[in-house]
Amino acid sequence: MELNTHNAEILLSAANKSHYPQDELPEIALAGRSNVGKSSFINTMLNRKNLARTSGKPGKTQLLNFFNIDDKMRFVDVPGYGYARVSKKEREKWGRMIEEYLTTRENLRAVVSLVDLRHDPSADDVQMYEFLKYYEIPVIIVATKADKIPRGKWNKHESAIKKKLNFDPSDDFILFSSVSKEGMDEAWDAILEKL
């Protein structure tokens, strides 16, 4: 599939099924804990500065945000999880919204699960990965902020993350940096393969 990634726009924000786009376009969902770099990932992948708003305040995305890419596919930005300052009730509401989308959306082709290369995956990261494996949803692990770690230590951090996730070697694992654009081509290859 040839994609003009410059031709991208935010299409709509949805709180539930009735608001989802009603067509056949394939979707790739992006999930990860708050401030893992999801907005930066979207902006880097689509060669845009601020299509997805980056925020110093975690927990800003509270709806599913659908991004139209060249009228051929969509990114779906899922609310960041694991943000402490959001009430338990809010978190449960998000949880249900995310679960409904991930388990019932026929357009969904795969989930890009973002983790921070600098740290061990959180319990939420592990739970998300297990959830995706349980429902047999294709998953691409993208380890963000690779530029913050010396290249010589990447392998060590990658191994630690894979071990904690109980990573399935048949899944893609991509080291990514929105600063250096490391892993961008690899991420696109993995995504397009799932469409």
Swiss-Prot record:
Ligand binding (Mg(2+)):
39, 61
Molecular function per GO:
GTP binding; metal ion binding
Example of a GO cellular component annotation carried by this entry: cytosol
Q: What is this protein called?
A: Probable GTP-binding protein EngB
Cofactor(s) for this UniProt protein: Mg(2+)
Biological process (GO) annotations held by this record are:
division septum assembly
Q: List the disulfide bonds.
A: none
The family classification in the record reads: Belongs to the TRAFAC class TrmE-Era-EngA-EngB-Septin-like GTPase superfamily. EngB GTPase family.
Q: Which function does this protein serve? A: Necessary for normal cell division and for the maintenance of normal septation.
- List keywords of the entry alphabetically: Cell cycle, Cell division, GTP-binding, Magnesium, Metal-binding, Nucleotide-binding, Septation
The cross-references to InterPro entries, in alphabetical order and at most eight, read:
G_ENGB_dom, GTP-bd, GTP-bd_ribosome_bio_YsxC, P-loop_NTPase
Organism this protein belongs to: Streptococcus pneumoniae (strain Hungary19A-6)
Q: Which residues form the EngB-type G domain?
A: 24-195
Q: Where do the annotations place GTP binding?
A: 32-39, 59-63, 77-80, 144-147, 176-178
Q: Does the keyword Metal-binding apply?
A: yes
